[in-house]
Amino acid sequence: MSDKTQRLEIVTPQRKVFSEDVSFLVAPGTEGELGVLPNHAPLITSLNIGIMRIQQEGKTFKVVVTGGFMEVRDNKVTVLANAAERAEEIDVARAEAARRRAEERLAKKTPDIDVLRAELALKRALTRLKAAGQ
């Protein structure tokens, strides 16, 4: 690792999604987007549903995270995400089906519908579609 990069690890309960040296990243913090360059001051923050943008050797990658925590320390960024997937791994048909289901639940407005859960499902689906370029 050079002094112009930092180690980024994104892990979920199921797997390690990303583990490489990167030059810059932007994470969806709960208080807004957070940019992290090498030698960033130590911090711990919570993450929102959103797209992480990662720069590595002049290329930009996207990883969808659905909440979790991020720690920055000693030129290493560790993301513990509830769920995460690289943009190229996203199954667009599955994300589109999830979007439709969430919209249908929200349109019903019956007492048995958990509105917050449906809104979060919709946000996850829309974020996945956006990351996939849809």
Swiss-Prot record:
Subunit details: F-type ATPases have 2 components, CF(1) - the catalytic core - and CF(0) - the membrane proton channel. CF(1) has five subunits: alpha(3), beta(3), gamma(1), delta(1), epsilon(1). CF(0) has three main subunits: a, b and c.
Q: Which CDD domains match?
A: F1-ATPase_delta (cd12152)
What are the UniProt keywords, alphabetically? Answer: ATP synthesis, Cell membrane, CF(1), Hydrogen ion transport, Ion transport, Membrane, Transport
Family that this chain belongs to: Belongs to the ATPase epsilon chain family.
Its localization reads: Cell membrane
Specify the species: Pelotomaculum thermopropionicum (strain DSM 13744 / JCM 10971 / SI)
Q: Which Gene3D superfamilies match?
A: ATP synthase delta/epsilon subunit, C-terminal domain, F0F1 ATP synthase delta/epsilon subunit, N-terminal
Q: What is this protein called?
A: ATP synthase epsilon chain
**Transport in keyword set:** yes
Q: How does it sit in the membrane?
A: Peripheral membrane protein
Q: What does this protein do?
A: Produces ATP from ADP in the presence of a proton gradient across the membrane.
Manganese: present as a keyword of the record?
no
Q: What is the lineage of its organism?
A: Bacteria, Bacillati, Bacillota, Clostridia, Eubacteriales
The molecular function terms in GO held by this entry are:
ATP binding; proton-transporting ATP synthase activity, rotational mechanism
Q: Name one GO cellular component term.
A: plasma membrane
Enumerate the Pfam families for this protein. ATP-synt_DE, ATP-synt_DE_N
